[in-house]
Amino acid sequence: DCPSDWSSYEGHCYRVFNEPQNWADAEKFCTQQHKGSHLVSFQSSEEADFVVQMTRPILNANLVWIGLSNLWNQCNSQWSDGTXLDYKXWREQFECLVSRTTNNEWLSMDCSSTHSFVCEFQA
């Protein structure tokens, strides 16, 4: 069972937080709400639809952080001759994903921007 202020779907509990934070702070906030809680992840279109239905009345047309980013899986790059990549001439861009609450369209955003978010844990 989900706590009283959380919504239930397919054995998972969800809660919308209309307190804009950056991605890392939102993820940390989620982990502090309940054991096993993280920013929402979608395993099916039905689950995504449920979250859209849940968030729309609270946030209207808005964006919410979801639990996808490239913050922790930067690849170890090396040159084709095997030497390490010590010199970088490109701008490092850390991207995190938001979901549009009206239609679940995913958009990449700068991880330091602030948005509302949805936390989820397995009941």
Swiss-Prot record:
Predominant localisation class = secreted
Q: C-type lectin domain: from which residue to which, for each copy?
A: 1-123
List locations, semicolon-separated: Secreted
Q: Which GO terms describe its molecular function?
A: toxin activity
Taxonomically, the superkingdom here is Eukaryota
Q: Matching InterPro entries, A to Z? A: C-type_lectin-like, C-type_lectin-like/link_sf, C-type_lectin/snaclec_domain, C-type_lectin_CS, CTDL_fold
Task: List, alphabetically, the Pfam families matched.
Answer: Lectin_C
**Keyword terms:** Disulfide bond, Hemostasis impairing toxin, Platelet aggregation activating toxin, Secreted, Toxin
List the cysteine pairs that form cystine.
2-13, 30-119, 96-111
Tissue specificity annotation: Expressed by the venom gland.
GO cellular component, alphabetical, reads: extracellular region
- So what family is this one in? Belongs to the snaclec family.
User: What job does this protein perform?
Assistant: Potent platelet activator that aggregates platelets via both GPIbalpha (GP1BA) and GPVI (GP6). Induces a tyrosine phosphorylation profile in platelets that resembles this produced by collagen, involving the time dependent tyrosine phosphorylation of Fc receptor gamma chain (FCGR1A), phospholipase Cgamma2 (PLCG2), and LAT.
Q: How does it assemble?
A: Heterotetramer of the subunits alpha, alpha', beta and beta'; disulfide-linked.
Name of the protein this chain belongs to: Snaclec alboaggregin-A subunit beta'
